[in-house]
């Protein structure tokens, strides 16, 4: 059963405050232990990443990114943490930017998108 709306509202307020400060550690502090991160649309084939994999990358991204097209969050069962974060961004830009970003920060090349049926 989901947490009471008051707990979810408090968590959302903390998330919005972290957004205003644009501080990676403030965001990460709200993530649950089972947190996952997903870039949308799914048709791009980007993998879902767990907290321990995305946290170091997220700290670097926050320093350079200034906006997103859309972001979706899901609360943990207790309502006091963020369980899942999904973001939508400019795919045409990301095709050129991702390899440069991963090379610059030493993450290697980004995962290759899987072919989507009918494409």
UniProtKB/Swiss-Prot annotation:
Pathway: Pigment biosynthesis. Transmembrane segments: none annotated. InterPro entries: NTF2-like_dom_sf (IPR032710). Induction: Expression correlates with the formation of the sclerotia and thus the pigment production and is directly regulated by the cluster-specific activator CPUR_05433. Part of the ergochrome gene cluster responsible for the typical purple-black color of the ergot sclerotia. The ergochrome gene cluster produces several ergot pigments including the yellow ergochrome secalonic acid and its derivatives, as well as the red anthraquinones endocrocin and clavorubin. The pathway begins with the synthesis of atrochrysone thioester by the polyketide synthase (PKS) CPUR_05437. The atrochrysone carboxyl ACP thioesterase CPUR_05436 then breaks the thioester bond and releases the atrochrysone carboxylic acid from CPUR_05437. This is Ergochrome gene cluster protein CPUR_05426. It comes from Claviceps purpurea (strain 20.1). The lineage of its organism: Eukaryota, Fungi, Dikarya, Ascomycota, Pezizomycotina.
